[in-house]
Design a protein with these regions (language model features):
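Loop-helix junctions at membrane interfaces
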Residues: 3-8, 12-221
Length: 221
């Protein structure tokens, strides 16, 4: 909770000294929705801190316990949780929450392996891209545009995070073959493509349900 409060206060202090205070009211609202997400922009300071703390804790739990191994394939729900985090608390706070979640999860069950910072970076970028796309593009109340934005999130995070960051990093460190051969092996033989499909399917299924839970007052369009 203390970390979440510190992060929130840092942004507030930065805003007071920056261009935010020279914006029109409408632009201020759009800026708040982009940075804090549409959900947090409509809530008070205490609610903002609570949401950030809860989602950071969820990221930690996802990295500690939501990982499953079947033969040579490792499944996890971190992509889904990271995307949900970025959408609900915004791209910047989402990035920080997901990066911290990966770090704490590693410390919990490192089992003697070295820390791989690119994994935390990729999860942070999943939240960053998801937050920007879902909160930055106005859906104008059109349900079909909501799903178009989700599809863009899935494609971009797959290409940027799974392929460009994680696969490239593992290839540089461990692979003895060409990049494209390793990419095919990692996606299909090691099952990373199916891990992505499961996480993205969960995003399409659960996000619309979460947005309809009235007590949470989550704004996604």
């Amino acid at each position: 909770m203390y970390e979440a409060k510190w992060i929130y206060q840092a942004f507030a202090d930065l805003s007071k000294g920056g261009f935010y205070y020279f914006m029109s009211t409408d632009r201020r609202q759009r800026w708040k929705e982009l940075v804090f997400s549409k959900t947090l922009a409509r809530k008070g300071k205490a609610h903002k801190i609570a949401y950030i703390a809860v989602m950071t804790a969820l990221c930690v739990v996802a990295n500690m316990f939501f990982e499953f191994k079947f033969m040579d394939t490792q499944f996890s729900l971190t992509i889904f949780v990271s995307a949900l985090t970025g959408i609900l608390i915004g791209p910047l706070f989402g990035f920080i929450a997901c990066f911290l979640g990966d770090l704490v999860g590693f410390l919990y069950h490192s089992a003697g392996f070295m820390y791989m910072p690119w994994i935390g970076l990729s999860m942070g970028i999943v939240a960053l891209l998801s937050g920007f796309i879902m909160n930055g593009i106005n859906g104008n109340g059109k349900p079909w545009l909501f799903y178009v934005k989700l599809a863009i999130v899935c494609v971009l995070t797959f290409l940027v995070c799974t392929v460009a960051i994680n696969t490239t990093a593992f290839w540089l460190l461990y692979a003895k073959v060409g990049y494209w051969e390793y990419l095919i092996v990692r996606l299909f033989a090691q099952g990373q493509i199916w891990n992505n499909v499961v996480n993205y399917a969960l995003l399409f299924l659960i996000l619309p349900i979460v947005s309809k839970i009235k007590p949470l007052k989550i704004y996604i369009n």
